[in-house]
Regions:
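Loop/turn elements at helix/coil->beta-strand transitions in domains of secreted/extracellular proteins
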Residues: 1-3, 30-34, 95-100, 153-158, ...
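Active-site nucleophile/metal-coordination loop of metallo-enzymes that catalyze phosphate/sulfate
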Residues: 2, 12-96, 105-114
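Metal-dependent active-site segment of extracytoplasmic phospho-/sulfohydrolases and closely related
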Residues: 4-7, 23, 185-225, 275, ...
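Catalytic metal-binding/acid-base residues of hydrolase active sites
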Residues: 11-12, 163, 212-214
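Short acidic/His/Gly/Ser-rich catalytic and metal-binding motifs that mark active-site loops
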Residues: 110-112, 166-171, 322
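Acidic, His- and aromatic-enriched active-site or binding-groove loops in soluble protein domains
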Residues: 118-149, 180-188, 226-241
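A long, amphipathic alpha-helix that forms part
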Residues: 138-153, 157-160, 165-206, 216, ...
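Active-site neighborhoods of enzymes that stabilize oxyanions during catalysis
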Residues: 237-342
């Protein structure tokens, strides 16, 4: 059996249908699609969800609260911290199973532990000279397809990732004509990847997901939580993460004091809600159309809030286990933490550390 995990970054479940996304729709109808999609971790951002796809571990164990991680009492970028747990790639290596990773965001290789794969692209986590890049400097879908076509896919586990949907939504907004055109293009790119799997389709389980969706961030002014906290002298550290923010209390702050700060955060104009995610971690999110930051927003679309937790979740393929997993996601909504245990079970690997 070969297991393929394909991620379309930020791709909205809501647009999957026969007209706009015929290739995704073919897999959804020949296999199974969760009626309400999957559900991301909070915050609804890229790197923490991708790391958890491969570890199956929650943020309370990894410190991956978003694109920022809280590890050893300091913030670090999640792609710099690495997965902070044993991954499917680690398990494949121990079990002498072969693995491949071909991704459209080169930072994901370190984030997901995919540099441990037998074959990974971009090589050593950096796009080779001459690679077609999108406006944010990530490999375009066409580069991913070419790399996949030049890779031996007769292997046990494959990770594919397409990044252009996320970039287009950030630049133009998720409801824009440019984003809709990108949905169609990336569906075609996805179809090209599926075609590469056809020779071994009878023995393949294909899991297709997105990590989150996006929302418009067209309000002319960001919510400046960090500067407010500094001016108020709050004993916290804060990192903005699109329409979400991570607030970590200093060690000396009591639970009672931190609870008072939660209330003050929720009274700030532009903040819609928040949740205590760990004793020292509060996750906040903006009102619709707003994002955290300073001055004018840098994007027309973003993510981070609970409004962006919906994921694509489709299981297909010619192997009989595809039907079993498909029935499971039809009966119970999957989430980010569902997939590592599922992949491990399919490949006969041990459970997560």
């Amino acid at each position: 059996m070969g297991v393929v995990f394909a991620v379309l970054d930020a791709f909205p479940h809501s647009v999957v249908g026969s007209e706009m996304t015929p290739n995704l729709w073919e897999q959804a109808t020949s296999g199974a699609m969760s009626a309400t999609g999957g559900e991301s971790l909070m915050l609804s951002v890229t790197y923490s969800n991708h790391a958890a796809f491969m570890t199956g571990l929650p943020p309370t164990e990894t410190g991956h609260w978003g694109n920022w991680a809280w590890i050893n009492n300091e913030f670090t970028k999640t792609y710099d911290s690495g997965p902070q747990g044993r991954t499917v790639f680690d398990d494949c290596k121990v079990a002498d199973l072969e693995s491949v990773a071909v991704v459209g965001d080169h930072k994901l290789l370190a984030t997901m532990g995919a540099l441990e794969a037998d074959t990974s692209w971009p090589p050593e986590g950096a796009p080779p000279e001459g690679t077609p890049l999108d406006a944010y400097g990530y490999p375009k879908d066409e580069a991913v397809i070419e790399a996949a076509a030049n890779t031996d896919l007769d292997t046990d586990f494959i990770l594919f990732h397409l990044n252009e949907p996320d970039t287009s939504m950030h630049m133009y907004g998720p409801d824009s004509g440019d984003a809709v055109a990108q949905y169609r293009r990336s569906d075609n790119s996805y179809g090209s990847l599926v075609d590469l799997l056809r020779p071994l389709w009878h023995d393949t389980v294909l899991i297709t997901v997105s990590d989150h969706c996006q929302e418009p961030t067209d309000h002319p002014e960001c919510v400046n939580l960090r500067d407010h906290a500094k001016a108020a002298g709050w004993p916290v550290q804060i990192r903005n993460d699109g329409t979400g923010a991570i607030v970590v209390a200093s060690d000396e702050v009591s639970q009672v004091e931190f609870a008072k700060l939660h209330s003050e955060i929720l009274q700030l104009q532009g903040v819609e809600g928040g949740v205590l995610a760990a004793p020292n971690v509060f996750l906040a999110w903006t009102e619709p159309h707003r994002m955290f930051g300073r001055g004018e927003p840098l994007t027309q679309g973003n993510h981070g809030s609970p409004r962006c937790t919906q994921q694509v979740a489709i299981v297909s393929g010619g192997h009989p286990e595809a039907r079993t997993i498909g029935a499971s996601i039809s009966a119970q909504r999957p989430g980010t933490l569902s997939w590592a245990p599922t992949i491990r079970a399919l490949l006969g690997l041990g459970s997560e550390a």
